[in-house]
């Protein structure tokens, strides 16, 4: 076996659950959100959140507009409330931010990613032929300075200072530190 961490962010339900079951160490979903909040193609079910929790895995909540309730119009409060609600399904020590950002990249980058090199057909992911580019970021997270907004938003929905710091980075650090 290879000592690596498996990331199932781009995988469907069955594959994700199978990876959690088969892996000898915890896996991650580095950038997705719960389906209970938004029915995005890559967002994860309560069953996956529970399996991640029980196996010691991690989820990073995504800021990519196609993964967000109300897309680019998602509010900071809604996003932070989703994180708080998620802690009923997965430990606050097993959650983080997985921004999945390509800020200020031209649409040609996403066109290249979706060019269908192997399938020979264009895959628009969660976009469409009419809306194939990068959607605008929510106003509260237009770049890395948005972490200040996340800090405030998490505190506003009831997370302690320690929990907020854990969610904003310490949990990822502690998770990966176990695999040195």
What are these regions (language model features)?
Residues 6, 31, 59, 100, ...:
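Conserved, mostly hydrophobic/aromatic
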Residues 24, 53-54, 84, 88-91, ...:
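Sec-exported extracytoplasmic/periplasmic mature domains
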